[in-house]
């Protein structure tokens, strides 16, 4: 099973520990992060055989696959047969049970002003927008469809309690697509997951329950309070704005959100790679009609690559839009003219 410094994988391993079995756990977080340190402390408390991944400067997905490959080598599991490998994973717990992305402000808006106002609040809180300076003026009207499409989907759930309707929006969009990339490449990794938080029975029970008790990981914290010692007192990594972990820990540990998962050197390399990808994307549209405002993108790439300013989000968005354009499919399904 994966065992990180968060709540999702810990809940799974805590339940597995109640059975008369030996448990192997894997943590592929970079050293010096809360994910790595808290995961190790949890493994000690739960008496698992724990492996930490020593590799450096790889992406999240690459570290995941590489850590499992290394684990199998260390356990001498290879018998010459190519096979599908399975591992318990806490994916889906944050949105499904912790209700990440859902806020009291969104709930209040949905209940007091209606789902149309809740859609606007979701767009703002989740930054579901495209920087308008990136888009040529004649195409900017297209992106008003973001709010419209969210509003239309929320209306599909109008028969539900408004707060739960908003949660279902995140379930049907973020949660449903969460593992898309992994399963698109499962033929390469040959790794499958046991996913308790995607179990239809668990999801149904959550959706039938009042939403307020789950907000900001409230239900999660109630569950953790019922754990036996010593695992109950091991710190965990909390989402920004959610109920904080009550246990003290070193302030020098890197936080997944505020500080980033990688260290400074790895982040610098990621930034260089992003700028390179941005220049490659710009080259694709240099001599073709496009929705992208090319001079602004060029200026952003130059400023970012020279570390004068950071336009990472801007460049990431541009790359995604250019990939859509150069696949000859535009937002209404027809080629761009």
Predicted regions and their residues:
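PAPS-dependent sulfotransferase catalytic core
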Residues: 229-312
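C-terminal non-catalytic accessory extensions
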Residues: 299-337
């Amino acid at each position: 099973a994966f065992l990180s410094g968060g709540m999702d994988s810990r809940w799974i391993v805590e339940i597995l520990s109640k059975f008369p079995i030996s448990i192997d756990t894997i943590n592929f977080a970079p050293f010096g992060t809360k994910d790595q340190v808290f995961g190790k402390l949890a493994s000690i408390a739960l008496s698992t055989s724990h492996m930490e991944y020593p590799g450096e400067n790889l992406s999240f997905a690459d570290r995941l696959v590489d850590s499992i490959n290394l684990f199998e080598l260390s356990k001498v599991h290879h018998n010459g047969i190519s096979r599908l490998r399975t591992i318990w994973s806490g994916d889906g717990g944050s949105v499904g049970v912790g209700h990440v992305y859902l806020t009291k402000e969104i709930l209040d808006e949905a209940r007091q002003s209606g789902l149309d106002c809740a859609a606007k609040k979701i767009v703002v809180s989740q930054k579901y927008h495209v920087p308008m300076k990136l888009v040529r003026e004649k195409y900017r009207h297209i992106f008003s469809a973001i709010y419209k499409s969210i509003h239309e989907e929320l209306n599909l759930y109008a028969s539900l309690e408004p707060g739960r309707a908003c949660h279902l929006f995140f379930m049907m969009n973020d949660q449903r697509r969460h593992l898309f990339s992994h399963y698109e490449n499962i033929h390469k990794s040959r790794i499958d997951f046991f996913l308790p938080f995607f179990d239809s029975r668990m999801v149904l029970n959550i959706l039938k329950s009042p939403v307020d008790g789950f907000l900001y990981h409230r239900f999660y914290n109630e569950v953790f309070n019922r754990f036996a010692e010593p695992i109950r007192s091991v710190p965990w990594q909390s989402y920004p704005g959610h109920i904080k972990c009550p246990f003290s820990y070193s302030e020098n540990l890197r936080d997944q959100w505020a500080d980033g998962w990688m260290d400074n050197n790895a982040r610098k390399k990621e930034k260089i790679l992003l700028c390179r990808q941005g220049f490659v994307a710009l080259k694709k549209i240099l001599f073709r009609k496009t929705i992208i405002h090319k001079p602004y993108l060029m200026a952003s790439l130059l400023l970012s690559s020279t570390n004068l300013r950071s336009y990472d989000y801007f460049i990431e968005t541009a790359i995604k839009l250019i990939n859509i354009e150069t696949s000859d499919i535009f937002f209404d399904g027809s080629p761009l003219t």
